[in-house]
Regions:
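Intrinsically disordered, low-complexity regulatory regions in eukaryotic proteins
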Residues: 1-85, 96-251
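Acidic, turn/loop-rich segments in luminal/extracellular domains of secretory-pathway
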Residues: 91-95
Length: 251
């Protein structure tokens, strides 16, 4: 017998990418029916937000020592799901349908894992899957500049010969036009203490470098002003929007 379920619910967490933006952004999760046979009627799906799912997940899958990594339920003021209580799977259009979620991302913190806890409350025509009716929609934040990069350059200690450095870098978004990375040869980590002491934040400005039309000026500072490295910004750092390449110079 066909059942109605949330795609991703069998893994308990469904991850979706959303961009930092000053405007509301849209993402989706999917309600589907099991099997490959067509539905013989439309299915009305009523869902709800169940905050208890977040606490249950945190207590089951994280230890007390990892409290800073707990999933946090996204504030309901920051999102809306217009069809939450009445999503329709139209049998003439297939066996599933996407559910749009509208989210305000500008104020979200990169080191917090935000989730939206959704649950199917009832359906018409077909039963609800007992193992696929509830899940956490996990938001993975990104922006235009975040992602994986290959760093190549050199460091120079006073009075010494420049030392060549090469290392892959993961650049994390922290806002619409800001990103964070571990500076120089520092190894990447998701531990709070390492982030505080070993990362810098780049701000990609709207100021175009004179003589170009695709190179923006970039400012650099310590991510954590109190615990982070003492950074002196050279004022010469840039981002090439065509090559998608950072050129950073700082002390």
């Amino acid at each position: 017998q066909k059942e109605i379920y949330l795609i991703g619910a069998y893994n308990r967490v469904w991850t979706t990418e959303v961009s930092y933006s000053n405007e509301e952004v849209k993402t989706y999760f999917t309600v589907s029916s099991s099997g490959t046979l067509a539905l013989d009627r439309d299915v009305n799906v009523k869902m709800k937000i169940n905050e208890e799912l977040v606490d249950i997940y945190n207590k089951k899958y994280w230890t007390v020592l990892n409290e800073d990594k707990y999933y946090k339920s996204l504030d309901t003021d920051l999102y809306s799901i217009p069809s939450l209580e009445n999503t329709v799977i139209k049998h003439a259009e297939g066996i599933s349908t996407e559910v749009p979620v509208l989210i305000k991302t500008a104020s979200l913190k990169i080191d917090q894992s935000y989730v939206i806890p959704v649950e199917i409350e009832s359906t018409t025509g077909y039963p609800v899957s007992t193992s696929g009716y509830k899940m956490l929609v996990l938001l993975k934040l990104k922006n235009e500049y975040s992602g994986s990069y290959q760093m190549s350059g050199h460091t120079t200690l006073e009075g010494e010969t420049p030392k060549t450095i090469q290392k892959p870098k993961t650049i994390k978004p922290t806002g619409v036009n800001t990103v964070r990375l571990f500076y120089a040869m520092n190894n990447e980590s998701d531990e709070k203490a390492d982030i505080q002491t070993g990362t810098i934040e780049l701000t990609i400005t709207d100021q175009i470098v004179e003589g170009t039309n695709d190179v923006k000026k970039v400012s650099i500072k310590a991510w954590d002003a109190e615990n982070g490295p003492a950074i002196i910004d050279s004022g010469e750092s840039t981002y090439n929007t065509t090559a998608k390449k950072f050129s950073l110079k700082y002390t």
